[in-house]
């Protein structure tokens, strides 16, 4: 069976989407499902990518993951590209602005592949950007909840 390919997306790919990538990876590894999924993350913006080289995960995001025993070493920001549409089955954005930009980058035929993470949860809404709030603990909580709900939906 071919693994389901999931791309988590946020604005800069240094906080929320890499947190989602590595939280989801941990979840599937713990459940023995690592072979069932291929997981990555990317940015809608190039703000964290200079001369083709992406910045590493923002230190407070990396530290929040580490508090939960999750490592993200080696991860660097990459930008979502139109050709990713054929490489991934599902694109999961963190907020409404990400979703708008994902539609712009991926094009009209991507509509059924683009979802917002918190829409998988009963409360919906956006994952607030901790870059502005400095609340990486809240971002972790929301992303964890969203990833749990996403995995449950995919396994249903």
Where would I find each of the regions flagged by the language model?
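Phosphate-binding/catalytic loops
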Residues: 84, 90, 96-156
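Conserved active-site segments centered on acidic
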Residues: 1-87, 152-156
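A structural signal for well-ordered alpha-helical scaffolds and beta->alpha junctions
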Residues: 54-58, 95, 147
């Amino acid at each position: 069976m071919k693994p389901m390919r999931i791309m988590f997306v946020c604005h800069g790919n240094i906080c929320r989407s890499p947190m989602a990538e590595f939280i989801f990876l941990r979840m599937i590894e713990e459940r023995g499902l690592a072979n069932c999924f291929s997981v990555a993350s990317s940015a809608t913006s190039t703000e964290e990518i200079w001369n083709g080289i992406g910045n590493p995960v923002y230190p407070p995001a990396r530290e929040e993951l580490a508090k939960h025993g999750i490592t993200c070493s080696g991860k660097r920001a990459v930008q979502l590209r139109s050709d990713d549409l054929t490489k991934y089955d599902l694109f999961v954005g963190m907020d409404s602005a990400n979703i708008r930009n994902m539609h712009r980058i991926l094009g009209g035929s991507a509509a059924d592949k683009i979802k917002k993470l918190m829409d998988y949860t009963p409360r919906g809404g956006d994952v607030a950007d901790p870059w502005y709030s400095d609340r990486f603990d809240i971002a972790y909580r929301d992303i964890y909840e969203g990833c749990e709900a996403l995995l449950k939906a995919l396994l249903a």
